[in-house]
Amino acid sequence: RRSWAVGLLIISILTMACGGAASVDDYKAAFVYLGSPNDGGWTQAHDEGRQYLVEQTGIETAYTEDVPPDATEFRTVAEAYIEQGYNIIFGTTFGYLDIMEEMALEYPDVIFLHCSGYKSNDSNYTNYFGKIYEPRYLSGLAAGAITESNKIGYVAAFPIPEVIRGINAFATGVKEVNPDATVEVVWT
């Protein structure tokens, strides 16, 4: 079910990014993965979405796995795809955010789609993400219901909109079932 949702999200993004006049034959999509497609989590969900995209549209895709969140590494991989005619580049980790923004300016005919970021431009660079705040709300309900101390910790990575939405959803869930509980956020 998760791969279906990721695939549907990707198809929706491609439909919006590519417009209605172009054919699927006009596009080739490359995915740059932080991890392995069989990691049982983040990268696997993206790869299952990529496979679903191929099944549903027939678009040609490729991927490179285990690309660290390093600008030089990402650029090397993405430019190799661009040289091969790939005109849609998916970057699937937060660490690719800035280099994708930079490359979008350098390659205006290539669409750059970044997962979990917050930057975009008006032409060829945007981000995508699922409604992760919904399960965070449910987690907050559970935490608020089982706490004995009324003190709940939340570990967060970066103070960006996506993370703040998750914190707010979690805290809302906690307060829904336990108005006396407090949530303390610790940043890594």
Feature annotation, model-predicted:
Residues A30-G49, L53-Q56, A62-F74, F94, ...:
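Extracytoplasmic "Venus flytrap"
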Residues L105-G130:
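Flexible loop/hinge segments that line or gate small-molecule binding clefts
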Residues R1-Y27:
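Short, low-complexity disordered leader/linker segments with a strong preference
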Residues A71-Y86:
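Short, well-structured alpha-helical segments in soluble
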